[in-house]
Amino acid sequence: IQQLLAQEPKPDHIIIETSGLALPQPLVQAFNWPDIKSQVMLDGVVTLVDGPALADGGVAHDLDALEAQRAADEELDHESPIDELFADQIGAANLIVLSKADMLDEAGIARARASVEQQLEAPTPIIPVSGGAAPMDAILGLEMEAQAHARSEHSHHHHHHHDDDH
């Protein structure tokens, strides 16, 4: 991040895409480091979820492939169960992008939404997207810092464990 900030002209936005296996909270906390916080505002955390998998009652269509990806990733520094990882990612989100909505009918989208909503501790927008095309105006400008206080008041010391995975 510091290398990006040293560039001229300075970037207007930095979008960090983490692996679907990443724990979001350590990255969010890194934006509170004094050297970073004085230069960058964390606008929000966007979590991408698999619409068809959620509609079918899971979080990924191929859990074996997901586990193989985890095992092969040498930089992965945690072994959280998939259900906890999914709950952490949903809990950190300021926006949830429901992917592959074009593969679902209205009932499937409703099932996928319900699966996500049961994980949420605070109201969080969920936007269905098709063909991987998420509207940038929805992703940029989330104003996470303005929402952070309200969220922390609501979920302070709340820890939930669920049986879903991402």
Task: Tell where the protein language model's regions lie, with residue ranges.
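Nucleotide-state-sensitive switch-loop elements of NTP-binding domains
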Residues: 1-84
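C-terminal accessory "lid"/substrate-recognition subdomains
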Residues: 66-166
